[in-house]
Each structure stands twice: as C-alpha cells, then as structure tokens.
Amino acid sequence: MAPHGRKRKAGAAPMETVDKREKLAEGATVVIEHCTSURVYGRHAAALSQALQLEAPELPVQVNPSKPRRGSFEVTLLRSDNSRVELWTGIKKGPPRKLKFPEPQEVVEELKKYLS
C-alpha cells in the first residue's frame, strides 16, 4: 500500500466585491419547467439554461425541480421573499409547438428587468 501524503491547508479565498446585481440576485433562483415527453423541450431548456448562466452566472438555474406538467414550458424567477415572477409561459401557446419556446434573449431581457 502506498504511503499517505499530508493534507495541505487551503489558502484563504479572496473576498470578491459584490456588485449591485449580485445583491439583488441573492437568494433568487430561476426555475425552468419543461415537459419530459419529448426531447425538444429538454433541448430548449438546456439552451435557455446556458444563456441564463452566461448572462447572470451568480444566479442559480434549476431545471425541473419537481415533476413537470404535461406540455409545459415555463420560466419562473423565485425571489428570496418567496414571491414568484413568471418570465415566460408557453402552456397555452401552440400548435405549432415552436410557439411554446421563447428565444433565449427574450427571457434574458425579461430577467434583466426584474434584477435591476
């Protein structure tokens, strides 16, 4: 058996300055609910999640935290005071199915309105 090495102490993490956006986003979460019956919903949810992470990396994004509704595609901002802001809903949209999905930039712009 190989000898065990010593653990090194972790260096102190540098304190980062918290800008206005991070303070507003503290405790907020973006939830994307999409139907799992078809892969198209999952692809659009992944693309939207990636766009939101690029725009606001400090904001956590959850995809389907609970069982989604059939035919649903919704994006919701959950604030720290337990209020919900609907950024996009495609439940009553369609057919055609492509009307259910937003352009990622539309949702990012809507999110910016609520974070500023």
From Swiss-Prot:
- Chain positions of cross-link Cysteinyl-selenocysteine (Cys-Sec): C35-U38
Pfam families, A to Z: Rdx
In the record, which positions carry N6-acetyllysine?
A: K20
User: What keywords are annotated for this sequence in UniProt?
Assistant: Acetylation, Redox-active center, Selenocysteine
> Where does the signal sequence lie?
none
Q: Which family does it belong to?
A: Belongs to the SelWTH family.
Q: What does this protein do?
A: May be involved in a redox-related process.
Spell out the PANTHER family in the cross-references.
SELENOPROTEIN H
Q: What protein name applies here?
A: Selenoprotein H
What species does this protein belong to? Mus musculus (Mouse)
Q: Species lineage, top-down?
A: Eukaryota, Metazoa, Chordata, Craniata, Vertebrata
- Provide the gene name from the record: Selenoh
